[in-house]
Amino acid sequence: MALRPGAGASGAAGAGTGPGGAGSFMFPVAGGMRPPQGLIPMQQQGFPMVSVMQPNMQGMMGMNYSSQMSQGPIAMQAGIPMGPMPAAGVPFLGQPPFLGMRPAAPQYTPDMQKQFAEEQQKRFEQQQKLLEEERKRRQFEEQKQKLRLLSSVKPKTGEKNRDDALEAIKGNLDGFSRDAKMHPTPASHPKKPDCPTSSHSTKTVSPSSAFLGEDEFSGFMQGPVELPTCGPSSTAQPFQSFLPSTPLGQLHTQKAGAQPLPPGQAPVSFAVHGVHGQIPCLSAASASHSMQKAGPSLEEKLLVSCDISASGQEHIKLSSPEAGHRAVVPGSSKNSPGLMAHNGGAVDGCVSGPTTAVAEKTSDQNLSKEESGVGVFPSQDPVQPRMPPWIYNESLVPDAYKKILETTMTPTGIDTAKLYPILMSSGLPRETLGQIWALANRTTPGKLTKEELYTVLAMVAVTQRGVPAMSPDTLNQFPAAPIPTLSGFPMTLPTPVSQPTAMTSGPAGSIPLSLGQPIMGINLVGPVGGAAAPTSSGFMPAYPSNQVGKTEEDDFQDFQDASKSGSIDDSFTDFQEVPASSKTSNSQHGNSAPSLLIPLPGTKASTDKYAVFKGISAEKPSENPASFGESGDKYSAFRELEPTADSKPLGESFAEFRSTGTDDGFTDFKTADSVSPLEPPTKDSFPSAFASGAAQQTQTQVKTPLNLADLDMFSSVDCSGEKPVPFSAAFSTSKSVSSRPQPAGSAAAPASLASTKASSLADDFGEFNLFGEYSNPASVGEQDDFADFMAFGNSSIPSEPKADDKYEALREEGSPGALSTSTVEGAHNPPVSSSKYDVFKQLSLEGAGLAIEEFKENTPSTKSDGDFADFHSSKFSSTSSDKSLGEKAVAFRHAKEDSASVKSLDLPSIGGSSVGKEDSEDALSVQFDMKLADVGGDLKHVMSDSSLDLPTVSGQHPPAAGSALASEDALPETPFPAFASFKDMMPQTTEQKEYESGDFQDFTRQDMPMVDRSQENTCPSPASSVASHETPKEGADDFGEFQSEKPKISKFDFLVANSQSKMKSSEEMIKSELATFDLSVQGSHKRSLSLGDKEISRSSPSPALEQPFRDRSNTLSERAALPVIRDKYKDLTGEVEENERYAYEWQRCLGSALDVIKKANDTLNGISSSAVCTEVIQSAQGMEYLLGVVEVYRVTKRVELGIKATAVCSEKLQQLLKDIDKVWNNLIGFMSLTTLTPDENSLDFSSCMLRPGIKNAQELACGVCLLNVDSRSRKEETPAEEQPKKAFNSETDSFKLAYGGHQYHASCANFWINCVEPKPPGLLLPDLL
């Protein structure tokens, strides 16, 4: 601490001291003291970490300690990847040379370099995709975040800040955006407090993550990112902490106060130093978070690390992750106490250092809070010292810069209004520009000084070359000012494009390194990374994450060293190293990170996500040293998970994996998917995963805008599955992680999982927050459902389940209970409850798996498929079941194992309820999932929009699957809120859950309080919950309807049992409807809507109609139409129901038509004066009105034919038809005054009747009248007859709409929607026809 020479230094010093307490002689230099060299300062920040851990320090110092870096694998890997994270960007690989100042390059073995380079390249490509995808996702995420904000205020706060501070950066930090989504994590945080220890660690991390998300703005804002570590605990506080006003210590203190630190955490805070005592809180909180959130916390921590990146945050993150993470991995799921203990140990050693770092960092960050991060901030604060000569040396400033300066200079300074169009002409996304601005604008907010302008232009130029400008320090890499390409200023040509681009590949990391400063900052200067590049932060964090992931390997070595030393200080140093390492990793992951970094806008989320993941990895390692048991456990969990399972490869794999996976948690977890590095390149390779994911995601996103948002976080990460992917990402992440290191990696997998989840939760968290909020361990607000679910499922870990625990609960459940599928089934909680929860969890896990599976199914990555498939089937289960990931995957897997297939995942959610069915469901699931994934994956998701839709999909599923689903349904309904997203995200899981959700809604909600919690719909009563879930009646009904259809086989029974089964006939009707709907509607909108709808549904369960309606907006007709019927006849079973349904629907239709016609008749009859009446009727409005009435009558005529065709007998229907004819005949008298009287032929639709032999009759049948949508009355009437009656011309008559798998006559659908109910009935043509 003594070394805190300055704010920047203090951050470094804090970090330095944090690790060793006194031993950390981190030079404040790191704080950004280092003047010009962003990297170096970062490194220095990292350096402090390095000091403690020289090997890592070298990495941190990267440049300074190239020797250290080369110290060994650690030095090599950790050094740059881990330690030099700051420089890591540079050391990325061989890229350290990019920085040139770093001899870190040697750190990586040629293979590593090669891998990194390749992965970097892939990442870069994927990131490019991600950027676009994430831009879209950002929009979605922003919307979702808004929803989320509604659901979770805290996240909202963070989001607001983030939005305000870095709306642009938001795009950049899409991952962060997701993190913001993850911000719900903050929402979760509140829950986390429930489980102070686990909760806490998770919370901190979560906040970190959230903050990371917010870090978009927060990181960029300042060290807040760091604060987020503690702050996230309380979103408000984090933001406060973000604010310089809130001293880090204070923030930490607040955090500590806000989220009681677990025993371990408390010690940590003390361990951290008095000053850091507060910080320790943060640290502790962080650690706690780490523990609690395990994966997410780690991820978030990583994110936090990235975010905070400042030594403090990084340290904290590291410490927390170290303590928390490690604890999390080993005990996160297993035992909060253990975690706590571990956390305590780790935290004590680690946190203390990190805390200090955080405190210092915080101060630093507070100082430079405006700036990216403390580290970055310091780097950035001393912008000029760090600025290359061509920025402050007038003689070296390019003419292009001067020209722009002259153009924008006014007497009052540089006119931002004039500069704006110039910057916009660079073609960079607003988020990227916002990020750059945030990084450069340090003097007067909103106004740039000359040097800042030059910095902005240079960073724009660098970014245009594909090298993310993590911080102004990056510019030090350029001997001459890079000239941006501005359409307005042709003179600016990016000459060095190729070089930077090259850098991007290799130097990408290095540039990030420069940026890397932030990256370094990420370590110590995490804030630099996080803050400096809050925009970058997301990026950077991701970067650090990446590196951290890599770091894991390196870190592991480092940690091992640290572990060997066994000194907590050392550990912390190690941990610090990890941050440094993280930076290094970042560097290392430069490959991944650079790519990540490069797609600053979109990458951020991924990056962040990954960052979190990485961070987790790194953290974990750091924790390793911190607590031997924990350390070993944690890191080993991680390490095991990664290095162990993927042990060796993981180092590389992790590096490359992370590197590759760095892009997003998903990649990460995808990587997990592709355990082998080979896979990582393909799948792991973000490019593949992300490419596919991105592409798929893009498709998905295209398909499913929501997906974009949800997936954005998740999707981008999970790219593979559209909706499912998001969840997959989060869950898959877990899963994949476990998958990746299945054997040993299991534990790590959970960490990874958690981490990924965190990261997913960060990224996915955003998504997860979107849906992850729901499904993800209750990522945050919505996460309540999940949290509840989690808590619910994790009765044992009820408190934790909330937010962190959600994951953790999930995790814990996975760990202890999840280890055995039983957990999922009921090991943890009450059979129903736990089963449910577990099921839910498993569903969630499975969902992840499913998502993953679906994801793999949907994902281009076959690897993922294979891996996950295995993982899904049983390999994952068996392998992962041991580890934390196992915990998660275990539940996941167990469910899977139970089911033996992806479906099994869902099946487990049924608890043991449909174990028998599970097997069949298994195959069916997988088959169906695959089928759906391929064909209806989207559909499934679409369906998943409403549980009813899912059931539909499942309806398509083989009945066996359906039945399994049925039981599962009960559970899923509850999870539906959580799983609504989940469902959305994972087609299979989703679909199963979805319909299961419906059932489960009923079942579960009735079953458990969890339902209430789960009831995102907020319907407390089971019935309500069911209804609320989808919409009370529609939702439940929809669900039921679909469910009944889906559980055609056993599920039907189950459904019936759940009183959700409609009628078999109905089921079949719906099923057939679904068949068309599934593919037609579900595929595109539903999936897109899926997340949104789900969110909506969950968010607004009360408006039953509205929700279904919303869903309906996507899968309106199917869901609405079928659900309505089902709704009504939900309790009915048998053939009668079908007929009754027709009678019921037509009765409503004719009743409404009678009202319309009668009103018209009464209105006209009410006009005493025939002259006035004639005038009214002949007026434009009168004619239009009567034309509408005529159309309504024509609908009744069509329905009448449908009634006759289906032989539906009902006195009420007959009476209604008679009444309508009476009123109509009366009304014709008035119409005779105009030319409106319809020709008899226009009312004769007998030619539209569908005969039994007609092919595709089901597709041609109108969902309202069951008549052929392609036939028109004009066939009966001659064209001549038609001509005078414009209302019935062939054009109008032929209008038909497709919705929910059904086609409708435009007039039928419009009448139904406007006069009967908002969702079309989706009646199926009876087979009897």
UniProtKB/Swiss-Prot annotation:
Biased composition of type Low complexity is found at 197-209, 874-883
Kindly state the positions of the motif DFXDF motif 2 in this protein. Answer: 785-789
Give the residue ranges of motif DFXDF motif 1.
Answer: 555-559
Q: Where is the composition biased (Polar residues)?
A: 578-594, 944-955, 1016-1028
Which residues in this protein are found as N6-acetyllysine? Answer: 609, 836
Expressed, tissue-wise, as follows: Detected in brain and liver (at protein level). Ubiquitously expressed.
Q: What residue spans carry the region label Interaction with AP1G1?
A: 614-878
Q: What SUPFAM superfamilies does the record tag this protein with? A: EF-hand
For whether the record's keyword set contains Cytoplasm, the answer is yes
Entry GO CC:
clathrin coat of trans-Golgi network vesicle; perinuclear region of cytoplasm
| Domain EH residue range list | 393-504
What is the membrane topology here?
Peripheral membrane protein
Compartments where located: Cytoplasm; Golgi apparatus, trans-Golgi network membrane; Cytoplasm, Perinuclear region; Cytoplasmic vesicle, Clathrin-coated vesicle
For bias type Basic and acidic residues, the affected ranges are 801-814, 864-873
PROSITE patterns reported for this sequence: EH (PS50031)
Q: Which residues carry this modification: Phosphoserine?
A: 571, 676, 815, 844, 864, 904, 944, 947, 997, 1021, 1088, 1090, 1102, 1113
Q: Which residue ranges does the UniProt annotation give for the motif DFXDF motif 3?
A: 867-871
| Sequence positions bearing Phosphothreonine | 1115
Query: In this entry, which stretches build a coiled coil?
Result: 112-152
Explain the purpose of this protein: Plays a role in endocytosis and/or membrane trafficking at the trans-Golgi network (TGN). May act by linking the adapter protein complex AP-1 to other proteins. Component of clathrin-coated vesicles. Component of the aftiphilin/p200/gamma-synergin complex, which plays roles in AP1G1/AP-1-mediated protein trafficking including the trafficking of transferrin from early to recycling endosomes, and the membrane trafficking of furin and the lysosomal enzyme cathepsin D between the trans-Golgi network (TGN) and endosomes.
Oligomeric state and interaction partners are given as:
Self-associates. Interacts with GGA1 (via GAE domain). Interacts with GGA2 and GGA3. Interacts with AP1G1 (via GAE domain), a subunit of adapter protein complex AP-1. Interacts with AP1G2 (via GAE domain) a subunit of adapter protein complex AP-1. Component of the aftiphilin/p200/gamma-synergin complex, at least composed of AFTPH/aftiphilin, HEATR5B/p200a and SYNRG/gamma-synergin, which plays a role in the AP1G1/AP-1-mediated trafficking of transferrin from early to recycling endosomes. Within the complex interacts with AFTPH/aftiphilin and HEATR5B/p200a; the interactions are direct.
Annotated domain remarks: The DFXDF motifs mediate the interaction with gamma-appendage subunits AP1G1 and AP1G2.
Q: What is this protein called?
A: Synergin gamma
Origin species, per record, is Rattus norvegicus (Rat)
Q: What is the lineage of its organism?
A: Eukaryota, Metazoa, Chordata, Craniata, Vertebrata
